[in-house]
Regions:
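Cytochrome P450 heme-binding "Cys pocket" and the immediately downstream C-terminal segment
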Residues: 421, 526-563
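C-terminal helix/juxtamembrane-tail motif
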Residues: 58-61, 68, 89-92, 561-577
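Conserved cytochrome P450 K-helix E-x-x-R motif and the immediately C-terminal K′/meander segment
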Residues: 144-169, 346, 350, 433-472, ...
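Conserved cytochrome P450 K-helix/beta-meander segment immediately N-terminal to the heme-binding cysteine loop
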Residues: 484-508
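Central I-helix of cytochrome P450 enzymes
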Residues: 282-286, 344-349, 377-429, 448, ...
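Cytosol/nucleoplasm-facing, intrinsically disordered, low-complexity tails
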Residues: 1-67
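N-terminal membrane-proximal hinge/A-helix region immediately C-terminal to the signal-anchor transmembrane segment
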Residues: 74-215, 225, 229, 251-256, ...
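Cytochrome P450 heme-thiolate monooxygenase catalytic core
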Residues: 96, 100, 202-211, 245-406
């Protein structure tokens, strides 16, 4: 067993010859010598020999007689011949076979050990004392199963964070030579990553979402020149002078919903599905304010349903189960989702044609002075053809309806569950102190979106450089895939994280919460979405109080956290109340 001892000594001490020839060893960082494991080495060696002897004996006992004869003949002829040629003729062949097997096993162990030490040295050379993020305790199979089949993914990330008490952790995934996949829930690190110009969206991740727009490059999922063109084309629509017109439309649509729907529910003393109603209201506001398109009631319900079906398939099912894209024709649900996608594209085409028709009737060839999203898209020459214009319209519908609607629905649900908070907000809104009312409304909105974030997380990004978390001595290496889970971002290291308490935001710094992402890929329509949510909340909470009649259930699909079958009942507040 002299060879084993030589291999062991080689692993313990650095290669002196390599030090002079290879600059890799010539690093300024002092590397500790490995401890003496001679006792452990002898124990492993003896244990391996004992195991080999027992294994060989058991194999021989179980071999058929004719195989035993062949095995003995192999030992006597071939092994004896090789041992004679190597000068080991006096050693029994069976001992040589056991030695060879033992040598291979010990060589594998030593090589693995040396490789591990080399990796540690290289890591120390590159990153110093900063370690990679810790692994989540969830095993590989559980991680894959949850990501592919479960609608409880946000709570899975939250549990992973709680298990190891860390807001940053790695996921165990079975991809050889693949980039590291890291969940990041630390607010400062998330901001640094998203604001870095080298951070880009992961194209494989967003390819499925792009299927909603039939795979055409668009403002939401694309990178590079096409995204810059789309962003530059629609940005003028969100200038303050144009937002005022959108706010006015938001007020009109809200009043119309109150008069035609909410009062009807109250007159009949019946409850209503808050999620469904907010989706229809948001869709109506968006189409009129952004696309100058007034929807009929039947069309409103139909497009709302088609949008939900297409979003669930392409932004969740197909994203997490790639086989559905290849073999989806065999599934009725996929065929239905593709039909919904076609209908959404037809609807977007109608919006585009409707705008052009109005422009022709007005006998105008100039760009409208009151720029809307549709006028920016239709009149811009930055688009190659109408397919890209239609794709951007569809993506505005996808990104601007359900997220905003369920933010409203969840906040109203929490206010109904917390009548004291609702009463304080109503008193502030009906009082004479506008600043206090605005601040309290902001706090309620922040707390509602913190407790019930409308999206499960910020989509996967690929980092363009190493990011260091100095407080935790953690490094996220260049090329890693980053995911920002909302429930970790909004709950980790927060006192009473499951409690709806808007007062926590009074002394909280502005940087403590990301509502609409940040950096160059932030939400282009965030000003319109915030204005809509703020106005609807203020209008409803000032004059009405709500009661929860059915909590329903929570579901994560199409990238949105939805309240399903959640029903509220409204009651008008008397002036003297």
């Amino acid at each position: 067993m002299a060879t084993h001892s030589w291999l062991y000594e080689l692993a313990r001490s650095p290669n002196k010859q390599a030090e002079s020839q290879n600059a890799w060893y010539q690093i300024s960082i002092s590397l500790p010598t490995l401890p003496d494991f001679s006792d452990e080495f002898e124990l492993v060696k003896n244990g391996a020999n004992s195991l080999l002897n027992q294994t060989c004996a058991e194999i021989e006992e179980r071999l058929p007689n004719e195989w035993k004869e062949n095995y003995d003949a192999f030992e006597e002829v071939h092994v004896a011949k090789w041992s004679t040629e190597l000068g080991m003729g006096n050693i029994p062949p069976r001992v040589i076979v056991k030695f060879m097997v033992s040598f291979l096993l010990m060589s594998y162990c030593v090589i693995s050990y040396v490789s591990k030490i080399n990796r540690r040295r290289r890591h120390k050379m590159l990153y110093g004392n900063n370690a990679y993020p810790p692994y989540a305790r969830a095993g590989m199979m559980k991680t894959i199963r949850t990501m592919m089949t479960s609608s409880q993914l946000p709570w899975f990330f939250k549990q992973c964070s709680e298990d190891i008490n860390s807001s940053v952790f790695r996921l165990r995934l079975p991809f050889a030579n693949a980039p590291m996949v890291v969940a990041v829930g630390d607010i400062d690190t998330v901001k640094e990553i998203l604001q870095d110009p080298g951070t880009i969206k992961s194209e494989p991740h967003f390819a499925s979402i792009a299927s909603i727009a039939a795979g055409v490059p668009n403002i939401l999922t694309s990178e590079g020149p096409q995204w810059k063109k789309s962003r530059k084309a629609v940005s003028p629509a969100f200038m303050k002078k144009h937002l005022d017109r959108m706010h006015h439309i938001c007020r009109e649509e809200t009043e119309d919903w109150i008069n035609n729907k909410l009062k009807r529910f109250m007159d009949k003393d019946v409850d209503f599905n808050i999620g469904t109603e907010m989706v229809l209201l948001t869709l109506s506001i968006l189409c009129r304010s952004a696309f100058d398109y007034e929807m009929k009631p039947k069309e409103l319900k139909a497009i709302g349903a088609e949008l939900s079906i297409a979003s669930k398939e392409f932004a969740f099912n197909e994203l997490n189960r790639p086989f559905r894209a290849r073999f989806g024709i065999l599934l009725s649900s996929v065929r239905r989702a593709r039909l919904a996608r076609t209908r959404l594209q037809d609807f977007a085409k109608n919006i585009l044609q409707g705008y052009r028709k109005k422009k022709r009737l007005a006998n105008s060839t100039a760009v409208s002075t009151e720029e809307t999203i549709i006028s920016c898209i239709a009149d811009s020459k930055k688009y190659e053809d109408d397919s890209q214009r239609i794709a951007d319209i569809v993506m505005f519908l996808f990104a601007g309806v359900e997220n905003t609607a369920y933010s409203l629905a969840w906040t109203l649900f929490e206010l109904a569950n917390n009548p004291k908070v609702a009463y304080d907000l109503r008193s502030a809104l009906n009082g004479n102190k506008d600043m206090r009312a605005q601040e309290m409304l902001k706090d309620v909105l922040r707390e509602g979106m913190r407790l019930r974030p409308p999206v499960s997380g910020i989509g996967i990004r690929t980092v363009g450089r190493d990011f260091y978390m100095d407080k935790k001595s953690i490094v996220i290496p260049k090329g890693s895939q980053i995911f920002v889970p909302s429930l970790v971002l909004t709950r980790f290291d927060v006192k009473d994280p499951e409690t709806f308490r808007p007062s926590r935001w009074r002394d909280h710094p502005e940087k403590s919460f990301l509502l609409f992402s940040t950096g160059r890929r932030n939400c282009v329509g965030q000003s319109l979405a915030l204005a809509e949510i703020t106005w609807v909340l203020s209008r409803l909470c000032a004059k009405y109080e709500f009661e929860v009649t059915s909590k329903g259930s929570t579901e994560y699909s199409s990238g949105t956290m939805k309240c399903l079958k959640t029903r509220l009942k409204a009651q008008c507040i008397k002036k003297n109340k």
